[in-house]
């Protein structure tokens, strides 16, 4: 790390020990020194290499300081225009940001800062973003900011080609990863004008295979319903899906509704709920829906019994 | 609160008060990173104390002068010399020739001043027009959403900041506190139609709100509270409302029925979370989501208490995440209590008791008093 000289900067020291202060913080000497300098340089709007270095040090101690990101961006934009190789300069900034990202997984400013850099970049590349995305998802496979950023990249680069395979890999690792499941929906919503019937049939098979593996998993069932509604005008597969869902509920529909102990276990309450929703939409199968909701209330998902009774009321 | 009809209360009220009080006192240097958002610490503490019936205006009234110092007004360098104003989170952020006010610190400060009953401030000192103008400048003209701060030099909406439903909520809540009620009131400062369009674009396929179709209880609460403050909940279709109620109730973790099959297989499932709420599908329950989910449900249906059997979530909070030794609430049963989860855990309990204004996240009685006294 290069050493910069700040000796000519007159710091704007932070006031401490104020009267009637709430949540007084015992600042370290280092924090006071850094903030004193940063306040002075921001106030002067000095756009220089040493100011850039200082922002890195501030981000290290206070990554939530929104103005410092803004300041850093203005410095980068200014110095980029003075540098001989803009691409190289911005890539170096992205490299720096990768390191900061790894150390601050929950900070959200990082991601919008990254977006600003890519918008500034003359030749941005999705491929360059993949390693940091991978590291962050390996660390926390459901990190909302990281997933949102990945989706932003897909839209920014208009590139969705790797998304289904990527989501499949993550579902392979953890079949309960809801972020990966909703990523598939994101894919279809944004790619839906260019997809074939074969692809849709493959996707349906993918969902059914995963449900077969673990029937009691809310994510693929929710996704299945959304997927079906999204493409309801494109493919007729209602009976196939209904037959499939029925295989997870045994013969409970034909049994009398008695006490919970008399009812057998079934493999999936979500299958039963899926069927109830489907049956409820058609007056001819409404009785089945009422029975399915009653079974959910009595035995298979009793914590939501008042919801199931509410659904029955809606049907009547 | 939560006083059982017989027997002692399960809520360790005194410990909670002490917990919140501690956060308003001297904090170790490990809190330096939160210095920029110190108004958040103040808000969570004062809100927590108010929930536990501490007379905060008497106890902390002496600090109003220091609080007021965080309000910064800037005259812009334009032809009309218009002014904008708002709050910084900490005086460290008050930098000459740089605009550093932001929306979250502004809302946290305003709500704290309301709880401290500094009505004189609202009636005579706070410049509501310039404050609303600051909010207005945070709106993105292209999307209708809000960023949280302005470029420190140009005073245009920051191009480095993110925009999302949280900041939309905060923007609208600030305007509401400034007296905006009707659509015309809001339209004076922001493009309400465009904002509504943005909120509607964040609806997810199977109900609830989130970015790019991944529903999230926190964003759902922000979206619904915003719509409520804009008197626009009826913009949502009946199907979407029903789907959202269903989605929210599914966030209540259960150890019964088929759900117990998950205990061996799902790494993010714990049977002992029974009754608590999670933020998204297949995640552990977490104290704060009890508030986000309950607040959302309460905005959508008058039957919310019956639908989610509030005694179950009360048990989850009191038996699993309440810290009986230190006071406060933790995120889950493993971690120590933290301020954010302590405030929201307490808020969830107060909401169940009908004593809490969920849209503004302060006790209802305090808001009623404020509305009575300060009608602008
Ligand atoms: Zn939480």
From Swiss-Prot, chain A:
It catalyses: L-cysteinyl-[protein] + (2E,6E)-farnesyl diphosphate = S-(2E,6E)-farnesyl-L-cysteinyl-[protein] + diphosphate; geranylgeranyl diphosphate + L-cysteinyl-[protein] = S-geranylgeranyl-L-cysteinyl-[protein] + diphosphate. Essential subunit of both the farnesyltransferase and the geranylgeranyltransferase complex. Contributes to the transfer of a farnesyl or geranylgeranyl moiety from farnesyl or geranylgeranyl diphosphate to a cysteine at the fourth position from the C-terminus of several proteins having the C-terminal sequence Cys-aliphatic-aliphatic-X. If X is Ser, Ala, Met, Cys, or Gln, then the protein is farnesylated, if X is Leu or Phe, then the protein is geranylgeranylated. The alpha subunit wraps partly around the beta subunit forming part of the active site. PFTA repeats lie at residues 47-81, 89-123, 125-159, 160-193, 199-233. Farnesyltransferase and geranyl-geranyltransferase share a common alpha subunit (RAM2). Protein farnesyltransferase is a heterodimer of alpha subunit RAM2 and beta subunit RAM1. Protein geranyl-geranyltransferase type-1 is a heterodimer of alpha subunit RAM2 and beta subunit CDC43. Present with 396 molecules/cell in log phase SD medium. The lineage of its organism: Eukaryota, Fungi, Dikarya, Ascomycota, Saccharomycotina. Gene3D superfamilies: Protein prenylyltransferase (1.25.40.120). It is found in: Cytoplasm. One of its GO terms (biological process) is peptide pheromone maturation. PANTHER family: PROTEIN FARNESYLTRANSFERASE ALPHA SUBUNIT/RAB GERANYLGERANYL TRANSFERASE ALPHA SUBUNIT, PROTEIN FARNESYLTRANSFERASE_GERANYLGERANYLTRANSFERASE TYPE-1 SUBUNIT ALPHA. Belongs to the protein prenyltransferase subunit alpha family. Its main location: cytoplasm. InterPro entries: Prenyl_trans_a. Its cofactor is Mg(2+). GO terms for cellular component: CAAX-protein geranylgeranyltransferase complex; cytoplasm; protein farnesyltransferase complex. It comes from the Eukaryota. This is Protein farnesyltransferase/geranylgeranyltransferase type-1 subunit alpha. Its EC number is 2.5.1.58, 2.5.1.59. One of its GO terms (molecular function) is CAAX-protein geranylgeranyltransferase activity. Keywords: Cytoplasm, Magnesium, Prenyltransferase, Repeat, Transferase. The keyword Acyltransferase does not apply. It holds the Pfam family PPTA.
């Amino acid at each position: 790390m290069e050493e910069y000289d700040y000796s000519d900067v007159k710091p704007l020291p932070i006031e401490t020990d104020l009267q009637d202060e709430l949540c007084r913080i015992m600042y370290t000497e280092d924090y006071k020194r850094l903030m004193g300098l940063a306040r002075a340089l921001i106030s002067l709007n000095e756009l220089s290499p040493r100011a850039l270095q200082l922002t890195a040090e501030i981000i290290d101690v206070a990554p939530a300081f929104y103005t410092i990101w803004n300041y850093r961006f203005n410095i980068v934009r200014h110095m980029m225009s003075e540098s001989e190789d803009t691409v190289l300069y911005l890539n170096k900034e992205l490299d720096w940001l990768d390191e900061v990202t790894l150390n601050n997984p929950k900070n959200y400013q990082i991601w919008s800062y990254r977006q600003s850099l890519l918008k500034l970049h003359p030749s941005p590349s999705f491929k360059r973003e993949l390693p940091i995305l991978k590291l962050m998802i390996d660390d926390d496979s459901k990190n909302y900011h990281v997933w949102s950023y990945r989706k932003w990249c897909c839209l920014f680069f208009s590139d969705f080609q790797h998304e289904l395979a990527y989501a499949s890999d993550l579902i392979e690792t953890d079949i309960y990863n809801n972020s990966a499941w909703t990523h598939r929906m994101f894919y279809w919503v944004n790619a839906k004008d260019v997809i074939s019937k074969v692809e849709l049939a493959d996707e349906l098979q993918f969902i059914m295979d995963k449900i077969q593996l673990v029937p009691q998993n809310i994510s693929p069932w929710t996704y299945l319903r959304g997927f079906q509604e999204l493409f309801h005008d494109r493919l007729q597969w209602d009976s196939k899906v209904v037959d499939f869902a029925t295989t997870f509920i045994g013969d409970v529909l034909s049994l009398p509704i008695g006490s919970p102990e008399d009812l057998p276990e079934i493999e999936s309450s979500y299958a039963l709920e899926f069927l109830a929703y489907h049956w409820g939409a058609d007056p001819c199968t409404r009785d089945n829906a009422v029975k399915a909701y009653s079974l959910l209330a009595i035995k298979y998902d009793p914590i939501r019994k008042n919801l199931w009774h509410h659904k029955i009321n809606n049907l009547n | 609160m939560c006083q059982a009809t017989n027997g002692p209360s399960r809520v360790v009220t005194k410990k909670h008060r002490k917990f919140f009080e501690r956060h308003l006192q001297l904090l170790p240097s490990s809190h330096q990173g939160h210095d920029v958002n110190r108004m958040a610490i103040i808000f969570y503490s004062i809100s927590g104390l108010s929930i536990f019936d501490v007379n905060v205006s008497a106890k902390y009234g002496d600090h109003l002068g220091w609080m007021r110092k965080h309000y910064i007004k800037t005259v812009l360098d334009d032809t009309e010399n218009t002014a904008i104003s708002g709050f910084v989170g900490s005086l460290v952020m008050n930098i000459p020739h740089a605009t550093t006010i932001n929306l979250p610190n502004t809302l946290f400060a305003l709500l704290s001043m309301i709880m401290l009953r500094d009505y004189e401030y609202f009636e005579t000192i706070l410049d509501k027009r310039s404050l609303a103008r600051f909010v207005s400048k945070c709106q993105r003209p292209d999307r209708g959403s809000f960023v949280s701060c302005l470029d420190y030099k140009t005073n245009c909406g920051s191009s480095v900041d993110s925009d999302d439903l949280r900041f939309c909520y905060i923007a609208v809540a600030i305007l509401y506190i400034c007296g905006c009620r009707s659509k015309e009131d809001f339209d004076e400062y922001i493009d309400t139609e465009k904002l509504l369009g943005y909120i509607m674009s964040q609806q997810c396929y199977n109900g609830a709100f989130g970015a790019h179709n991944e529903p999230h209880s926190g964003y759902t609460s922000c979206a619904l509270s915003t719509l409520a403050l804009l008197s626009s909940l009826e913009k949502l279709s009946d199907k979407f409302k029903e789907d959202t109620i269903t989605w929210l109730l599914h966030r209540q973790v259960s150890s019964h029925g088929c759900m117990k099959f998950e205990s061996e297989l799902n790494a993010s499932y714990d049977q002992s979370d029974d009754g608590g709420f999670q933020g998204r599908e297949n995640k552990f329950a977490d104290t704060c989501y009890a508030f986000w989910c309950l607040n959302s449900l309460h905005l959508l249906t008058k039957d919310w208490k019956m639908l989610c059997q509030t005694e179950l979530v009360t048990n989850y909070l009191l038996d699993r995440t309440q810290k009986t030794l230190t006071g406060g609430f933790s995120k889950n049963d493993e971690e120590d209590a933290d301020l954010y989860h302590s405030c929201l855990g307490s808020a969830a309990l107060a909401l169940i008791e009908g004593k809490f204004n969920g849209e503004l996240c302060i006790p209802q009685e305090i808001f009623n008093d404020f509305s009575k006294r300060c009608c602008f």
